[in-house]
Amino acid sequence: ISNLYAYENYLNKNYKKKFKNYSQLWNWSVKYPSDFWKSITEFYQVPLIKNKNSKLIQKNTKFWKNNFFYNFQTNYIQLIEKNNSNDLAIHFIGENYHEEKITYKELNLRVNALSSYYRSLKIKKGDVVVGYLPNIADTIISFLASAKIGAVWSSCSSDFGAKAVIDRFSQLKPKLMIVADHYFYNGKKFEYSKNLRQIRSKIGNPKTLKTSYPCKNNRSELHRIYRNKKYHLEEKTKLVDFNDPLYVLFSSGTTGLPKCITHGH
């Protein structure tokens, strides 16, 4: 059963609708946008806290200036935190043939520990944390820990050269940069630590936190934080406005400096 079919059934049952096809559903969604977005938050169980003067849509004559979920509070990571089971959350297999399986319970523990470490550095809502990292579990965890405290995340792949990273991160003035020791591409190992000093000097000299490409008995600085009981006390998730920044992606930079594309919660 598809999500769309399940959603149609939800509307038919809870909103007394009798949609016969997708076109009817679409017409209803644009004619009654407040009802549509309300139903979406209910169907997907989006955690939203209503405040005084909250509006599902603060309308503007220009569509792109509409303010969705105005004055509602939430946090993206709550969608992850509500699952604290031993179900598989991340399954990683590296080019070095190392395999790593992380349950939702373990994922939440690691995110909690890392967010506690961030707070120990006085990183707060609106501050920027960046990752110069390959596609590994630590990258996901670093992002989620940033979201948990209301900080803003951005990242560059570890195969980016120094200039490409500087062009992006220099626009953000990060408080912390998380890096790995190496990455693999097409079966070959590549070190990229030689880029770090140049990059840091051009983006405001943020503190650096190092991890290692996944391996057996990972003793990297980041993994020591995961294991450190000092950071195991439960951290409260920071509630933010729905439209507060969550992460920044960048355009390709083919027509000048890469453009920041900011995504909210």
Residue ranges and their predicted role:
Residues I1-W64:
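N-terminal amphipathic, basic-rich helices that act as targeting or association modules
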Residues V30, K38-N51, Y70-H91:
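A short N-terminal helical cap/helix-turn-helix that marks the beginning
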Residues Y117-F160, A164-I166:
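Conserved AMP-binding/adenylate-forming
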Residues S29, I77-E81, L107, V111-L114, ...:
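Adenylate-forming
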Residues T103-K105, K238, L246-H265:
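Conserved AMP-binding A3 loop
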Residues N14-Y15, I77-T103, C215-N217:
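AMP-dependent adenylate-forming
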Residues N96, V179-F242:
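ANL superfamily adenylate-forming
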